[in-house]
Amino acid sequence: MNNYTREDILRMVEEEDVGFIRLQFTDMYGTLKNVAITSSQLEKALDNECMFDGSAIEGFARMEDSDMYLRPDLNTFEIFPWRPQQGKVARLLCDVQKADGSMFESDPRYVLKKVIAEAKEIGYTFDVGPECEFFLFHTDEDGLPTTFSHEKASYFDLGPLDLGENARRDIVLTLEDMGFEVEESHHEFAPAQHEVDFKYDEALLTADNIMTFKLVVKTIAKRHGLHATFMPKPKYNENGSGMHMNMSLHNEVGENVFNDKHDPNGMSKEAYYFIGGLMKHIKAMTFITNPIVNSYKRFVPGFEAPVHIAWSRKNRTPLIRIPADRGGNVRIELRSPDTAANPYLALAVCLAAGLDGIRSKIMPPDSIDRNLFEMSEEELKEAGVEKLPMNLMEACQEFEKDEYIKNVLGNDLVQKYTQAKKKEYEEYVTQVTEWELNKYLHRI
C-alpha cells in the first residue's frame, strides 16, 4: 500500500506534468463515478472542498439534502499509463462526506471500512484475493458491443485459438504499471472468456483494486477494438463469469488465524466458524454478491458455478472450497460472487458474516467431498444441503429476512437498494423475450 502525503501528491503532479485528476467514487451498484478537476484545483480537492450533487447518484441523497463532498484517499493516487504523456491524467479514490463534515453512511466504501474496523477491534485483518473473469467480444460497425467472437478457444488455450491474447497481455502490463502484482492470467472455459488474478491484499485495497481492474480491462479492450463485459452470463449454454473470493484472517502479528496444523484439515476453529457464518447468511448475502437479474442465469449445474450451500476441502462443486494451502496459509474460497457486485458491499457482507460465525461459534455441517451435481435430490435432502436463491427476487426475500446482514448496510442503503432491485426485477419479468416468441408465437 502507498503511504502518500499531501506534499507527495502535489510534487508528483508537478513533476509528472499531470493536467487532470479524476476524483472517483462508486454509487450503490458499484458503478464508478468521477469528478474531473485540473491540477490547479488539486489543493482545493485535498482540502475536501470538492462538492457534488448527491441526489444525482443512485443510492445517495435526497434533492433537499444533496450537497456532498469528496474526501480523497491519498494512498490511492495513480497516474493512468494509457493517457497522453503531456497533460497526464491521474486519479484519487474518494470517500463521501455530508455537508456537516460527517461521513456519508451509505457510501459503499464507508460501509466496508466500518466492518473492517469491527474486525480490527477484535484483532483481525481481513485479506482477500479475487479471481475476476470477463468476456472480450467484438463490436459492430458502429462501435457498439456485441456477444460475437471469432475465437474458439477454451481453458488455458493460447494463440492462435485465443484471439484476445494480445489484449489480455496489455491489460496485465498496464495493471503492473499501476502497481498491481498480477499472479497469473489465462483463457477461461468459454470462447472469448478470460481471467486475471492479482495478489491478495487487505480488503479495502482489494475492493479499490477491483474497481481499478474493471476500468483498466474496459479501457485496454477498447483500444484493441473489443468490448470487455463483466456481465455474469452473456451467452446461453456457456460458462458464466464469476469473481471467486479467497479470504483469510490474520492476527496482529500477521499470522493466519485459519491455520491449525493439529486439525486433520489444517484448519483452526476460527476457520470453521467463519465458514459457518458464511453458510448461515449466504442466502441474504447473495442479494449483494450477485446483484442483477442476469447473475442467476450463472447458477446452473454443470457450468463451474455453485448451486448448493455446502463446503469441501477439495471439491469444486459446492459454494465454499478450501484450496490446497500454500505454505500453511489456509484460505476460504467463496465461489458464488460475480463481478456485477459492488466490491465494497460484497466484501463487507462476507466479512460481517464470517465475524458473526466466529462470535457465535457457528460450526458448519460436515464437508461434502463428492460431486454435488451428481447427487440425487433425495441424497441432497438427506445431507441437509440447501440451494442458493435461484433468482433476484428470491434473493431479495432472503435478504429482507436477515436483520444481521441488513444492519451491515444500514437502513437508508437497504431501503434504496431493495427498492431499486425490486423495480429491476419487475421490469425483467414483464419483458417479452426472444425465447418466448420462438417458443410460442408459431403454435399458439
Residue map of PLM features:
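Catalytic-core signal marking the mid-to-C-terminal active-site face
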Residues: 212, 220-222, 226-227, 252-444
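Active-site-proximal beta-alpha loop/turn segments in soluble metabolic enzymes
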Residues: 148-158, 191-205, 235-240, 255-258
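Short glycine/proline-enriched loop/turn "hinge" motifs that connect secondary-structure elements
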Residues: 81-88, 125-127, 185-190, 238, ...
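ATP/Mg2+-dependent ligation/transfer catalytic cores
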Residues: 1-184, 206, 226, 382-444
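Loop-centered beta-sheet repeat module
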Residues: 207-214, 223-231, 243-249
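A generic structural motif
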Residues: 27, 97-103, 160, 200-206, ...
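Core alpha/beta catalytic barrel or barrel-like domain that forms the active/cofactor pocket
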Residues: 127-138, 145-147, 178-197, 228-245, ...
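Short, hydrophobic beta-strand segments
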Residues: 92-98, 194-200, 247
